[in-house]
Amino acid sequence: MTLQLRDGVSVADTDYGMALLDEDSGQYWNLNPTAALALRTLLEGGTKAQAVQELTTQYAVDADTANRDVEDLVGELHAAGLVREAAAS
């Protein structure tokens, strides 16, 4: 499963990770560097497993923890209405 931002959501890299802006509501979310890496991987067409691999490669985190973090991130982004699953290509 890969993700895409829904229409009306902008993304910007920051010194501390990534910021997402919901242009419809004016709300924004700050993602820390690990969440930003995971989301970037998913937005670029990567799978959850690839996002986990990126996290375990670049940070001192085990696969189980990274997997939980990716699952939590995706769930929270879906709940906030910021992302949707990308159509299969």
Residue ranges with predicted function:
Residues 1-36, 40, 86:
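Acidic, low-complexity/disordered tracts enriched in E/D and polar residues
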Residues 27-89:
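Long, charge-rich, low-complexity alpha-helical segments
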